[in-house]
Amino acid sequence: GWFKVVSAEYLNYDKYNDDEDAWYYADGSGNLYAGEFKTIKGKKYAFRNDGRMLTGLKFILEDDDNDNLTVYADDDGTYNFDNEDDFLDNAVAFYEPGGYKCYYFGGGDDGAMRTNKTTVEIDGENHNFYFEKSGSKKGAGVTGEKDDKLYQSGMLLKADSDDKYVVVDKTTKYTTNAAGEKVLDYVTYNKLDDAKEFMAQDDVLESNTAVDADGKIDLGNNNKKKAEDISEAYTIGYKAYGSSDMTTHEYFLVNTSGKVIDNRGKNKDGSDYY
């Protein structure tokens, strides 16, 4: 059953030295659960390699063959994720490419894995997350699209109230297998800072938009503005990818609720970019 004690010195010297206790679980034969996920009385838990039950938000790399979990906490000192920017930056740059999945085990001494839509507090602010509800990836933060919204490692990607809209870069990475075939490696979703960062992407092709005979600029979708009211105007195109490309990009516009904008309306962000 469950028991809460200070770790033995040989298991975790730092926790032993700090007199910091943690929850552990042993089965009826006295075997300690460690380095694995376990379902106990209908709820799923995860245990570090030294047996400590996990709580809170964690990135985990699971090694089933060796009963081993590599665990990162939000403030471990490397690849931190104790604020929104660090969470997304490190999820895209390190955790997702490395095969790590984000899980949430509640606060305090709860420890039960959360699934479905969940609110998680990071750096004093509440963030919307979505964790897989079933299957082999149950509890893992979703990376991809759910209900017309985009998620990275479970976190909903949305614009803040000042920006109104934000561009999300979907990056797909491929690799080559032993047979020399091109196969999917991983996919990440990255929020770009603003329209200028979007236009600066290598595969975004821009050209100045001409002024027509009426002194107006066509912004597309029957949206014309007087040239004198526009400081910058560009026609945007995208690189055409071929079968040999090992990295591809797609771009999506999302609003403050995280909904992907797929209509042809006149959408203007907080910096007056259409």
Features from the language model and the residues they span:
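Extracellular adhesion/carbohydrate-binding repeat motifs centered on closely spaced tryptophans
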Residues: G1-Y274
